[in-house]
Amino acid sequence: MGNQMSVPLRPGDQEHDPEADTYKVTSDNECVQNGIPVVVSTRVIQHYEEVDLGINSLKDNVPASSPETMEAHAVADASGKNLGKGSKPKAPAARSHFFLTLSRPVPGRPGDQGTDSSAASGRLDVSPGTAPENKDPSEHGALPVAAAPGPAPDKTPGCTEAKQQTLPATSPLAPSPPESQAEAPSRPKDFSFLNRLFKLDKGRESAPADSPPEEGKGSKSQERAIEAPAVPGNPHGVSAGKDIVDSEERKQEVDTLSYSVPADPEVLGTTKEDPQVVDATENSNSIMSFFKTLVSPNKTETKKDPEDTDAENSPTTPANLKSDKADLTPQETQGTAKSSKGSSQPGQAPSAGTSDTAREGGKEKAGPTSLPLGKLFWKKSVKEDSLSTGAEENAVCEPPVETVRLEEVESTLQTVDLTEKETQTEPTDVKVKEESKPRRTPLMAFLRQMSVRGSEGITRSEESNGKDSSCQTSNSTEKTPSPPEPEPAGTAQKNKETSSKDKKSVDKKSAAESNKQKNGKPEAREPAPCVQQPTVEVNALQTGDKTPKRSEKRRQSLGGFLKGLGPKRMLDAQVQTDPVSIGPVGKSK
C-alpha cells in the first residue's frame, strides 16, 4: 500500500540534491505510512495477549496502543516541523512511533540507537514506503543482523545512510526485551486482577496495587526511549530496496520476539505470585494459630474455673445435704457422670474443653475439680435423691472413675476409709475401688511375680546358709536375725535389682540343694518370719488384705538373698569345704 503511493513521488523529487532526496524519502514514508505502525503494534501486543494470557482481545489492544501512539505522535509533530528542506507532513496525527532528529546522521554512532526500545518497533515498520531499487539477494538472503555490521558496496548515494538506518533498526532487536518486559508484566497483572476478583483471593490483593506503578514505569521507559534518540543523531537516509525486505524480516523477528520474550515475564509474574500464595497460606495458618491461641486460654480458664467454683461449692453441698463426709463422694461421682453426659449434649467445643478439664482435673483432685458444669448438676442432685441417682450413674461411669483413682493412690486410700465407715450407702464406690486396687500397681505386681519365681530357691538358700553357719559357730541364731534389720531401708533401693538377682538365685538354688543334702538341720527357719511379721502388719494396714502375701514373699526373697550373701562369703573366706557354692558366689561378686 505504502509502496504504491510512494513510488510516483520519488521520480519527481530526484531533481534535488541527495540530502534533500533522503529527507524527502523519509518524510514521504512517514506521510504515507499513517496506520502501519499502529497495526504492527497491535500485532505485537496481540502476540503478548496470546502468549501471556491466552486471549485475543482487540479491545485491550486499542487502548493499550493508543497512549503509545499518541505520545509518539506528539513528539513526532514537534520534531516533524524541522525534518528537512522539502519535508511537508501531511497527516501529523497518525505519525509512526519513531521521529527524525534535526542534525545530519553521525556515521560513528549507529550503535547508540540500541537504547531506544519503543522507537525500535517503530523503526522496524517505517521503511516499506520507498521504491524497490536495491533488492540484492546477496545482502538480504541472511538476517538483517548479519547484514548490518558489514557495509557492502553502495549503488546509490543514500545507501550509506540506509546502512546506518539498518543498524539501529536491527540492533534494537537485542534490547527490545525491555519493552516487552515493560509491557508484558503490566498486562498480565491487569488480567490477573480480574482473576483475583473472580477467584476472591484476598491474599493477593497487594499485587494489583503494584501494577499501576509498573505501568507508569513502562510509560516512563517509553518516554525515555522516545527522548533518547534525539541526542545521538538518528540517520535520515533510507534505501528503498533494503528496507522493504528488512521490514518484512523485522516484522517476523518482532513476532518471534513477541512469542519468546513475553513468556519470561509471564514466568516472572507467576513467580511473583507464588510467594503471594505462600503468604496467603501462611496468613491462613497464622490466623488458625491465632484462633488456637484464643481457644487454648479459654481451656486453661475453664481448667482454672472448676477449681475455684468447686472449691466454693464443695463445702456448700454437704451443708445442703446435711449428711456425713461419706455423702460427698456420691456427689463427686454424680458431678463427673452428669457432667460427662451434659457435655456431650451442648456441642463439640464444650465437650473438648470439658474432656481436657476432666483429665487434668482428675490429676489434680479426685472428684470435685473435674468440670464447671458439675455446679449445675450438683444443684439438681441436691434436689433429687442423691443416693439412687449416684448408684445408677456410677454404674454407667465406672471406667473414668477408675482411671482417676488409678492416677492417685492417696485419694483412693482416703475414699476407701470413708467407704469402710459407711458401706451401705455406697456399694458401687466400694466395687469401683476394689477393682482399682489390682490395676493400681501393675509394675509392682510384675516385680512381685519375678520375686515369687526366685523366692523358693532363695528361702532354701536361707535354710542351707543358716545350717552352714550353725555348723561353724554356735551363735548362728543370733547372727541370722541381725541382717534383716536394715532390710526395709534397703528394699526400696533394690526393687530394681530383683530381676537380675532372681537370675542369680536360680544359680544358687542348685548350690543350696547340695548344701541341704549335706546338712539337714532346720534351725534358721524361724527367725526370718519372726522379723518379717511387723512389716506384714504394716502392709496390711496400708494396702489391704490382698497385697501383703505377695509383699511378704518379696521381702523374704530380698532378705534371703542378703542373708545368703553374708554366710557364703564367710564360708569361702574361712573353711572352703563347699566347692559347689564357689561358682555362684563368684558371680554374685
Swiss-Prot record:
Keywords, comma-separated and alphabetical: Cytoplasm, Phosphoprotein
Tissue specificity of this protein: Expressed in cerebral cortex and cerebellum, but not in other organs.
Biased composition (Low complexity): 166-185
Entry's Gene Ontology cellular component terms: cytoplasm; synapse
Main location: cytoplasm
Region (Interacts with DYNLL1 and DYNLL2): 570-589
Modified residues (Phosphothreonine): T480
UniProt region (Disordered), positions on chain: 1-28, 62-589
Subcellular location: Cytoplasm
GO biological process, one term: myelination
Start-end of Polar residues biased regions: 330-356, 532-545
Organism superkingdom: Eukaryota
Biased composition (Basic and acidic residues): 12-22, 198-207, 214-226, 243-254, 357-366, 418-438, 494-511
Modified residues (Phosphoserine): S127, S192, S314, S381, S482, S557
Record function comment: Required for myelination.
Record note on quaternary structure: Homodimer. Interacts with DYNLL1 and DYNLL2.
Protein name, entry field: Breast carcinoma-amplified sequence 1 homolog
